[in-house]
């Protein structure tokens, strides 16, 4: 997780809940707090933190979660998610940036980006489950390089626009990217975690607190 101190209002709940989830499944949890750049939006420091972690650690898999995510239970393991969605040709799994309405109808959250890019399923860079291999390292090298060169890098949603317009348009990259279904993670209540969006830090904190109390304090 990459989370700067200004997010402590809700990471005081998110971090200990993720730590307990990781402890339950014998995973390691890492928290990166410091920005890497003065001239780039913090989303690029998040991508940089993932890149650095891949190069500095010998883990087989890495899950990056945004600071505004929190586990909803400790039952679902990463191994189960990998078994379900990391098929033989996939290297990276993203959260779908959308929700299922009426159970079966999927709609992207960013309709403007979906229509412009002609992609109904868009990646959400707030939840990324990946292998730690040369192909994934090269993926993050390229993604980060666009932060300094792409006109999309400064237009929200910055890193996701770069991903959609400049990376997923490459066949070899599109083929290595997959998605977890919305029942795993979404902005309502996924089986693994909930990813809050379009809310103030105080609103996120208020929504996270009861989950934290149920899973950590009980």
Predicted regions and their residues:
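Catalytic core and acceptor-binding pocket of nucleotide-sugar-dependent glycosyltransferases
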Residues: 48, 120-218
């Amino acid at each position: 997780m990459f989370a700067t101190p200004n997010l402590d209002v809700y990471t005081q709940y998110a971090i200990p809940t993720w730590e307990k989830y990781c402890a339950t499944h014998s995973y390691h949890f890492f928290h990166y707090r410091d920005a890497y750049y003065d001239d780039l939006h913090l989303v690029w420091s998040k991508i940089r933190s993932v890149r650095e972690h891949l190069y500095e650690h010998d883990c087989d898999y890495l899950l990056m979660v945004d600071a505004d995510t929190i586990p909803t239970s400790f039952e679902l393991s990463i191994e189960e998610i990998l078994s379900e969605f990391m098929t033989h040709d996939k290297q990276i799994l993203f959260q779908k940036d959308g929700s299922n309405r009426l159970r079966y109808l999927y709609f992207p959250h960013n309709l403007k980006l979906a229509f412009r890019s002609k992609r109904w399923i868009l990646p959400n860079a707030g939840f990324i489950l990946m292998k730690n291999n040369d192909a994934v390292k090269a993926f993050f090298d390229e993604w980060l390089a666009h932060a300094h060169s792409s006109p999309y890098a400064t237009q929200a949603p910055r890193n996701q626009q770069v991903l959609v317009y400049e990376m997923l348009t490459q066949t070899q990259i599109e083929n290595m990217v997959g998605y977890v279904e919305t029942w795993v993670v979404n902005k309502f209540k996924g089986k693994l975690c909930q990813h809050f969006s379009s809310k103030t830090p105080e609103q996120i904190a208020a929504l996270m607190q009861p989950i934290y109390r149920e899973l950590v304090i009980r």
